[in-house]
Amino acid sequence: MNRFLTRRKVFVFCAALLLFSGNCTRVSRFVESADPYYTQTYKSVCDRWSQEARIHHGFELSLIVSATFESADFRRAYADEYAQAYQLTPAEKDQFMEDQMKAGRLGHEFLMATFVPETKWDDFDRADSMWKLLLVNDEGERVAPVEMRNLRRQKAVMSHFFPYITPWKSVYLVRFPSKTTESNRPMIG
């Protein structure tokens, strides 16, 4: 009797397996991991114009800074990605691209994300900040930012475009003048 129940269980299991696998198909190939970006070039261009630095005192982390220089090359790739992400019409995309290029002519902009372990140290946008930001060119000429703005409310949206932005980092837009103050020559290139 026990042997009969075992055969019956095997038969029921096989019948159920055949019944439920009738609509299944074999996977012929896997698709590569889904890239979160809509355009082919954005990630490589973003990586080319972005850097990260860390400051440690012994084993203690004092600062993480991630920044992207918003060059003309970056702005074109960003505008393409933005247009795809937000499904802009061709006219809207052209306007966004024009706005990006115009902003690039106002000065050298960087998007900067920072992490500091003490919230009181997160004062990059204050005039009396403990931090001093300077843009230094190949000739050693230095300029201070003409604008530094904390972008508090835009973090969730911006993390798609700047993957180093996390909930633990503060995000700033930093604009430097395009020309040196002493020689009035272009600061970069």
Model-identified regions with their sequence ranges:
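C-terminal motif of bacterial Sec signal peptides marking the signal peptidase cleavage site
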Residues: 20-23
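Sec-dependent N-terminal signal peptides
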Residues: 11-18
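Conserved functional micro-motifs across diverse proteins
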Residues: 25-189
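Bacterial N-terminal signal peptides that target proteins for export
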Residues: 2-11
